[in-house]
Amino acid sequence: MTLGLVGRKVGMTRVFDEQGVSVPVTVLDMSANRVTQVKSKDTDGYTAVQVTFGQKKANRVNKAEAGHFAKAGVEAGRGLIEFALTEEKLAELKAGDEITVSMFEVGQLVDVTGISKGKGFSGTIKRHNFGAQRTSHGNSRSHRVPGSIGMAQDPGRVFPGKRMAGQYGNTKATVQKLEVVRVDAERQLLLVKGAVPGAVNSDVVVRPSVKVGA
């Protein structure tokens, strides 16, 4: 139950620390996060804050969205997301507030969630890291097949969850405990160590890590 930010993956680069060591980082644009609604147990049955991010053209906003954003007094965004919060933290926020990247600090660990890159229909070698069979010496047309996928007449079926070929990627993925390397409050940029899920320009959600000290 922590507050986070929604940002845009700009790309990867590297920075140098005080010892001159090259550190690979992902640049995240965390600008324009606005509170659109504060939900309480009295009115909604649970406590959470609703946030919008980015911008949307006026001709792309329907009447329901326009009314919702106008009530909050914020510019229309690309989407809405909720963060579950305690009543104490919820009391510090109100509709129309802007949440900035300053909520993070250098050295802090964060969890980043995004939609992984889609790889299309992939076989078991690529999708599940299966080993390939021999390329020659008696092997014919079975170089990349997964092998047996079931049993005999009993049970006479393939068990659910069997690792097989299929859609690979394009799913929600989270990378945990990434270190914040730099916080650029002026340009609302966040630099985190390592790679994060998703393609360039895709949306990501950044939250304080839930496994700090673990």
Curated annotation (Swiss-Prot):
Chain positions with N5-methylglutamine modification: 153
Protein modification: Methylated by PrmB.
GO molecular function: rRNA binding; structural constituent of ribosome
InterPro entries associated with the record: Ribosomal_uL3, Ribosomal_uL3_bac/org-type, Ribosomal_uL3_CS, Transl_B-barrel_sf
TM helices/strands, residue ranges: none
A single Gene Ontology CC term: cytosolic large ribosomal subunit
GO terms for biological process, alphabetical: translation
Stretches the record annotates as Disordered: 131-155
Domain of life: Bacteria
Entry keywords, A to Z: Methylation, Ribonucleoprotein, Ribosomal protein, RNA-binding, rRNA-binding
Pfam families attached to this UniProt entry: Ribosomal_L3 (PF00297)
Classification via NCBIfam families: L3_bact (TIGR03625)
Protein task: One of the primary rRNA binding proteins, it binds directly near the 3'-end of the 23S rRNA, where it nucleates assembly of the 50S subunit.
Family: Belongs to the universal ribosomal protein uL3 family.
Subunit-structure text: Part of the 50S ribosomal subunit. Forms a cluster with proteins L14 and L19.
This protein's name: Large ribosomal subunit protein uL3
Species in which this protein is naturally found: Neisseria meningitidis serogroup C (strain 053442)
